């Protein structure tokens, strides 16, 4: 057996093959240990000592490491994770009011989308993450806090530009012989990559979709989200409708609200018009401050008025409360400790 890639990115039958086990059930055993957070072959007590030693010589379970851990007073946890090539990403644990624990995972080192209001978008893009590097973020978080309830791909990067690896990671995390996380508890967030939305819909996964709309004003969206705006709002609406119809699931529209930028009555009406005919729910996200970006968090009255306008139009809407601000772990802040 020759040295192989990190086993955290493999399915049971692939572990069986690369490890050249004689017994067919050994791949499942190793897969279960990895899903349970094991990082040492010698701790896999249902394997023979000879097999454990052979695995330790030829394979690695994980090739990432946590280099920093930050905790906020609101319960948010941010991990800085170093990859094999010394590049770095961040993963975040979010805890809501009823103590549900959600892993916010990254899918790229940096991000090519260059959204004007996002810290990660200012870093530029280095490379995609592998499935193992995505899975390991989840495993690192579970080692810190125990069982996680949900996963959101809302960390660093555009998931639709690394969809194969993202879906591969989902397959591993949801595998019934491993972690067995329900696909229904997983959300993929995109800046509005239409081709990716169609592709995700056609894969027939049970995951949820969130779209970072930010504004339904085309010129403003082109300024705030220059790469995402390459697909017109009309094309984006068609892609969302396709996902609605193909999956039968409601789509979340995310609006990062910035003071005096996208919070007027006209902007609200444009969102209402965009949402018409779609099965969507709107999330309002007051912009989280980033030192190098010169926007401002909206006043409470701006957010409340915007929310009221959507409610009056019978658009389902929720205001997301800020979490992780104290450690740079909130929406739009990731990358401060990572670099590219």
Swiss-Prot record:
Residues 97-325 form the Radical SAM core domain. Specifically methylates position 2 of adenine 2503 in 23S rRNA and position 2 of adenine 37 in tRNAs. This is Probable dual-specificity RNA methyltransferase RlmN. Its EC number is 2.1.1.192. GO terms for molecular function: 4 iron, 4 sulfur cluster binding; metal ion binding; rRNA (adenine(2503)-C2-)-methyltransferase activity; rRNA binding; tRNA (adenine(37)-C2)-methyltransferase activity; tRNA binding. Its cofactor is [4Fe-4S] cluster. Keywords: 4Fe-4S, Cytoplasm, Disulfide bond, Iron, Iron-sulfur, Metal-binding, Methyltransferase, rRNA processing, S-adenosyl-L-methionine, Transferase, tRNA processing. The active site is at residues 90, 331. S-adenosyl-L-methionine binds at residues 157-158, 189, 212-214, 288. Disulfide bonds join 104-331. [4Fe-4S] cluster binds at residues 111, 115, 118. The keyword Metal-binding applies. It comes from Treponema pallidum (strain Nichols). It catalyses: adenosine(2503) in 23S rRNA + 2 reduced [2Fe-2S]-[ferredoxin] + 2 S-adenosyl-L-methionine = 2-methyladenosine(2503) in 23S rRNA + 5'-deoxyadenosine + L-methionine + 2 oxidized [2Fe-2S]-[ferredoxin] + S-adenosyl-L-homocysteine; adenosine(37) in tRNA + 2 reduced [2Fe-2S]-[ferredoxin] + 2 S-adenosyl-L-methionine = 2-methyladenosine(37) in tRNA + 5'-deoxyadenosine + L-methionine + 2 oxidized [2Fe-2S]-[ferredoxin] + S-adenosyl-L-homocysteine. Belongs to the radical SAM superfamily. RlmN family. The keyword Cell inner membrane does not apply. It is found in: Cytoplasm.
């Amino acid at each position: 057996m020759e040295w192989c890639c990190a086993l955290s990115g493999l399915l049971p039958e692939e572990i069986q093959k690369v490890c050249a086990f004689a017994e067919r059930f050994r791949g499942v055993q190793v897969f279960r240990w990895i899903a349970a957070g094991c990082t040492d072959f010698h701790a896999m007590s249902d394997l023979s000592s000879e097999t454990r030693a052979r695995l330790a010589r030829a394979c690695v379970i994980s090739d990432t490491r946590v280099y920093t851990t930050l905790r906020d007073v609101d319960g948010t946890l941010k991990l800085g994770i170093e990859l094999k090539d010394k590049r770095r990403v961040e993963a975040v644990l979010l805890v809501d009011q009823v103590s549900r624990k959600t892993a916010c995972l990254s899918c790229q080192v940096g991000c090519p989308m260059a959204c004007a209001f996002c810290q990660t978008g200012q870093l530029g893009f280095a490379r995609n993450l592998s499935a193992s590097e995505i899975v390991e973020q989840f495993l690192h978080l579970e080692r810190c806090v125990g069982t996680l309830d949900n996963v959101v791909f809302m960390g660093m990067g555009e998931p639709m530009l690394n969809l194969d690896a993202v879906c591969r990671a989902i397959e591993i995390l949801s595998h019934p012989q491993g972690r067995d996380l329900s696909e229904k508890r997983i959300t993929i967030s995109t800046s509005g990559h239409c081709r990716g939305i169609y592709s995700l819909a056609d894969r027939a996964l049970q995951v949820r979709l969130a779209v970072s709309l930010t504004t339904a004003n085309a010129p403003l969206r082109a300024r705030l989200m220059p790469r995402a705006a390459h697909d017109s709002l009309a094309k984006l609406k068609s892609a969302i409708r396709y996902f609605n119809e193909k999956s039968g699931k409601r789509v979340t529209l995310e609006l990062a609200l910035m003071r005096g930028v996208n919070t007027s009555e006209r902007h609200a009406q444009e969102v209402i018009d965009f949402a018409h005919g779609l099965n969507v729910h709107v999330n309002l996200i007051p912009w989280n401050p980033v030192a190098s970006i010169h926007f401002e968090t909206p006043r409470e009255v701006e957010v409340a008025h915007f929310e009221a306008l959507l409610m009056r139009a019978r658009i389902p809407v929720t205001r997301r409360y800020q979490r992780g601000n104290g450690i740079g772990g909130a929406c739009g802040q990731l990358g401060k400790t990572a670099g590219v």
